[in-house]
């Protein structure tokens, strides 16, 4: 009798598209920079889903082109040379491309070349929303941005501020770390816990497995999973070792993180967080196979310019240090510590999951089934 596949092999087969997606999912929108970081006429290189991309703001509008000359493949951003507002010239042989459509319009070293007008760099759709620059890597016409951000992110009266940093782990470890309700133990000593007097247990003892998640997959809308562990479990505030109390959670005055959800292509929404009037939206943007851009934003509903200005000051003066760094630095440590275990893909079959991981399992399944394409290494 032939050897039967193990439970781990059968399980990972269900997630096979997710496991293949080391470089992320194609045909989706991703934030790559804050809008304020792309100044007029100042090209900025980024890497997204393994592709080198060059951004520039021309006449107020941001464009994105392939950061590689068609001639000999050198990286344009290694030495940026722009001799006109609307073009960039390769520093090696002077091939000159337009920012808006990537078209090769001149060659400084051979003005009569037959290649002029016949070639073009790859371009990428760009949208600027809520102070972020989103880039679409894919084929054909892009889907509406609203389908690739969590519900509520684009609400007209919601002000958004954020920051980003590079993390040395695959994007999926970032997504699963953020969506892992059972990992709150690592935050027990965070300055946010006492500094903002929040309620933070050590973990959760799950109830009925069938009530722990809810998925949203309607056509034309964002697709994601809600973690209902907080609603259908018993919070653990006292950690026991061999029958004796060892550590304790924090019973503060502020209840936060009531609703936690994750959405394609890899963005978490925690509401409210880190304060009852705030919502955290954070992306795990694939850079390459072993790193991701951790794009953290906080949103607040504001009804006046004064309120918007006050939130902006509060974001920079309080929440960056107390929450985005003071709390989430623990998450970065966990992701980078997991990376070696999953780098060669063996971790997906060797991991041993437990009851609170139900939401992660649902996320893997939803992402495998509803992504719009897998980015392959080029």
Curated annotation (Swiss-Prot):
Which PROSITE patterns does this entry report, sorted A to Z? RIESKE
One Gene Ontology BP term is:
carbazole catabolic process
Q: Which UniProt keywords apply?
A: 2Fe-2S, Dioxygenase, Iron, Iron-sulfur, Metal-binding, NAD, NADP, Oxidoreductase
- InterPro entries found in the cross-reference section: Cholesterol_7-desaturase (IPR050584), Homotrim_ring_OHase_catalytic (IPR021028), Rieske_2Fe-2S (IPR017941), Rieske_2Fe-2S_sf (IPR036922)
Instruction: Domain (Rieske): give its ranges.
Output: 29-135
Co-factor remark: Binds 1 [2Fe-2S] cluster per subunit.
Cysteine pairings via disulfide bonds = none
* Residues bound to [2Fe-2S] cluster: 69, 71, 90, 93
Q: Which cofactor does it need?
A: [2Fe-2S] cluster
User: A GO molecular-function term, please?
Assistant: metal ion binding
One Pfam family per UniProt: Aromatic_hydrox
EC number of this enzyme: 1.14.12.22
Catalytic reaction list: 9H-carbazole + NADH + O2 + H(+) = 2'-aminobiphenyl-2,3-diol + NAD(+); 9H-carbazole + NADPH + O2 + H(+) = 2'-aminobiphenyl-2,3-diol + NADP(+)
- What does this chain do? Part of the multicomponent carbazole 1,9a-dioxygenase (CARDO), that converts carbazole (CAR) into 2-aminobiphenyl-2,3-diol.
Assembly and interaction partners: Homotrimer. Carbazole 1,9a-dioxygenase complex consists of a terminal oxygenase component CarAa, a ferredoxin reductase component fdr and a ferredoxin component CarAc.
Question: Know the name of this protein?
Answer: Carbazole 1,9a-dioxygenase, terminal oxygenase component CarAa
Gene designation per UniProt? carAa
């Amino acid at each position: 009798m032939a050897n039967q596949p193990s439970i781990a092999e059968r399980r990972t087969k269900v997630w096979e598209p997710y496991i293949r997606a080391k470089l992320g999912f194609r045909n989706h929108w991703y934030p790559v920079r804050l809008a304020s970081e792309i100044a007029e006429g100042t090209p900025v290189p980024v890497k997204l889903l393994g592709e080198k991309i060059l951004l520039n703001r021309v006449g107020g509008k941001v464009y994105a082109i392939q950061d590689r000359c068609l001639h000999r493949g050198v990286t344009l951003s290694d030495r940026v040379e722009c001799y006109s507002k609307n073009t960039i010239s390769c520093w090696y042989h002077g091939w000159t491309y337009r920012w808006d459509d990537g078209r090769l319009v001149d060659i400084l070293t051979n003005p009569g070349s037959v290649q002029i007008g016949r070639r073009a760099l790859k371009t990428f759709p760009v949208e600027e929303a809520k102070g972020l620059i989103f880039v679409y890597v894919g084929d054909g016409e892009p889907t509406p941005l609203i389908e690739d951000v969590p519900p509520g992110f684009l609400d007209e009266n919601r002000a958004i501020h954020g920051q980003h940093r590079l993390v040395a782990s695959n994007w999926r470890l970032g997504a699963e770390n953020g969506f892992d309700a059972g990992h709150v133990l690592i935050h027990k000593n965070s300055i946010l816990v006492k500094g903002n007097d929040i309620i933070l247990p050590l973990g959760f003892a799950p109830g009925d497995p069938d009530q722990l998640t809810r998925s949203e997959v309607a056509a034309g809308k964002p697709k994601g999973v809600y973690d209902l562990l907080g609603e259908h479990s018993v919070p653990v505030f006292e950690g026991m070792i061999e029958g004796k109390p060892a550590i304790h959670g924090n019973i503060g005055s502020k209840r936060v993180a009531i609703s936690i959800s994750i959405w394609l292509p890899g963005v978490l929404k925690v509401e409210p967080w880190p304060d009852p009037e705030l919502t955290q939206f954070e992306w795990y943007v694939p850079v390459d196979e072993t790193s991701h851009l951790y794009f953290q934003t906080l949103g607040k509903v504001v009804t006046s310019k004064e309120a918007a200005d006050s939130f902006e000051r509060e974001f920079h003066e309080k929440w960056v240090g107390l929450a985005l760094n003071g709390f989430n630095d623990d998450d970065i440590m966990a992701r980078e510590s997991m990376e070696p275990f999953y780098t060669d893909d063996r971790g997906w079959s060797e991991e041993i999951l437990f009851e609170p991981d139900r939401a992660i399992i649902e996320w893997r399944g939803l992402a495998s089934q509803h992504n719009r394409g897998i980015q392959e290494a080029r």
